């Protein structure tokens, strides 16, 4: 086998806090890669469909990876929002959510065995055979972009079309126009050409593992006639959003539909008032 040695140096400017290493991930790329196709399989897995246009636009197109990671976890019953994943894995140095290592670490914080890997078709087929969807990096053209760009998609299966005697892959493309258009297929020959080899594998969460997923605090709303806005209230105490608040304030109106996950709901952005409250969108 191949051995690897890592050195981690921890430091903090807060003399009252002891720095601690909670999760460590490492990835390597082989110098020589004998790509293999493996044996064709015919299996389709369920993977929730999330698209960029329905979620927080402040992260930009880098939001594709948090969308796919949320889908990978939610298929195992996690019910995490892509925005929660994005805030966990955001690279504070660049403000980007496109770092695959941070994505794997975010899933690890939620209790899921997750790792980056360079995979070929054989590896991907083995993952699908084992019942596990995979995040894959595809080079493709995006509307409005002249040059091909990398897009993270969710691989959810392989199939065969008897009519044309061709194999195909089943993908979830978060850059689609709507949630209903996320599911797509691609011929295996085309997939092999556009797939970069970068992948993120995720396995079901063990029952006995400790997780550190985002904390959710149930609050109520109270209306202020004086300020003409709504405020969050926690146990009767008004909670004001600070001026430097950098999160995403959004509401999800009841639409009478039983959604598979919370992330399937339609969220509408809310306006933060100068007093630290909210205003709902005009249509609400």
Language-model regions, residue ranges each:
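Conserved active-site-adjacent core of cysteine acyl-enzyme catalytic domains
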Residues: 73-75, 79-208
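Short, surface-exposed beta-strand/loop "edge" segments at domain boundaries and coil↔beta transitions
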Residues: 14-17, 143-147, 177-184, 209-211, ...
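Low-complexity, Gly/Ser/Thr/Pro-rich intrinsically disordered linker/tail segments
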Residues: 188-245
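Active-site-adjacent structural segments surrounding the nucleophilic cysteine of cysteine proteases
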Residues: 9-95, 159-165, 221
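Extended low-complexity, serine/threonine- and proline-enriched intrinsically disordered segments
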Residues: 232-265
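Short, aromatic- and glycine-rich surface loops/edge beta-strands on solvent-exposed regions
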Residues: 4-10, 249-250, 278-284
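Aromatic sugar-binding surface patches on proteins
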Residues: 266-283
């Amino acid at each position: 086998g191949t051995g690897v040695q890592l050195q981690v140096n921890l430091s903090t400017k807060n003399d009252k806090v002891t720095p601690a290493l909670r999760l460590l991930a490492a990835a390597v790329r082989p110098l020589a890669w004998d790509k293999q196709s493996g044996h064709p399989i015919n299996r389709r897995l369920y993977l929730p469909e999330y698209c960029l246009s329905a979620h927080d636009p402040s992260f930009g197109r880098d939001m594709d990876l948090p969308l796919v990671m949320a889908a990978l976890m939610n298929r195992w019953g996690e019910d995490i929002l892509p925005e929660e994943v994005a805030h966990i894995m955001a690279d504070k140095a660049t403000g980007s959510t496109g770092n695959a290592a941070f994505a794997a670490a975010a899933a690890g914080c939620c209790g899921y065995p997750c790792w980056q890997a360079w995979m070929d078709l054989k590896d991907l087929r083995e993952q699908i055979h084992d019942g596990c969807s995979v995040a894959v990096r595809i080079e493709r053209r995006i509307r409005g972009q002249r040059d091909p760009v990398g897009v993270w998609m969710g691989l959810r299966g392989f199939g065969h079309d008897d009519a044309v005697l061709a194999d195909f892959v089943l993908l979830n493309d978060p850059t689609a126009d709507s949630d209903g258009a996320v599911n797509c297929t691609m011929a295996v020959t085309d997939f092999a050409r556009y797939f970069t080899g970068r992948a993120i594998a995720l396995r079901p969460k063990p029952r006995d593992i400790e997780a550190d997923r985002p904390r959710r605090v149930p609050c109520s709303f109270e209306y202020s006639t004086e300020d003409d806005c709504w405020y969050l209230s926690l146990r009767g105490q008004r909670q004001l959003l600070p001026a430097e608040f950098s999160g995403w304030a959004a509401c999800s109106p009841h639409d009478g539909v039983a959604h598979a996950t919370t992330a399937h709901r339609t969220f509408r952005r809310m306006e933060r008032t100068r007093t630290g409250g909210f205003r709902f969108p005009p249509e609400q």
